[in-house]
Design a protein with these regions (language model features):
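Acidic, low-complexity proline/glycine-rich segments
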Residues: 1-14
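Amphipathic alpha-helical coiled-coil segments
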Residues: 46-51, 112-121
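Helix-loop segments that flank and shape redox-cofactor active sites
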Residues: 12-35, 57, 90-97
């Protein structure tokens, strides 16, 4: 996967994630998604700046993000994108080792979010379940 495609898909993921965050009726889901999209925005900015320092300017397109309704599927799709990019870069660790490490930090954040979504969202309930 070229860095241009990776950048475009990463921006699209953040847009979908932010939309899911705003649409959810579950407070724990709202918070978990907010943590991830804020982390991803800072992470992606830092990663792409470092890449441009390493390899020159990146020309990428802003792609239309396909809407999703399931936040777990959305995060898992992005983990797949991260794993593909990481796998290709890992073939030349001497050159891309720093990038592999950065991608792994984003994967870690995704896995933490998946843990929260799978274990806390359904257990805490939604607004209509509150005794108010």
């Amino acid at each position: 996967m070229e860095i241009t495609e990776f950048a475009s898909k990463s921006f699209a993921f953040r847009d979908v994630l932010h939309m899911l965050h705003l649409k959810t009726k579950s407070y724990p889901e709202h918070i978990a998604l907010e943590e991830l999209y804020k982390f991803q925005l800072k992470w992606l900015d830092s990663f792409l700046e470092a890449w441009q320092g390493f390899d020159g300017d990146i020309e990428f397109d802003i792609v239309h993000a396909e809407p999703k309704t399931n936040c777990i599927d959305c995060v898992m799709d992005y983990v797949g994108i991260l794993m593909t990019a990481k796998g290709e870069m890992a073939e030349d660790m001497e050159t891309y080792g720093w990038a592999v490490n950065e991608i792994e930090s984003m994967m870690k954040q995704c896995f933490q979010t998946l843990y929260k979504l799978k274990n806390f969202v359904d257990n805490i309930g939604k607004k209509e379940d509150l005794p108010i």
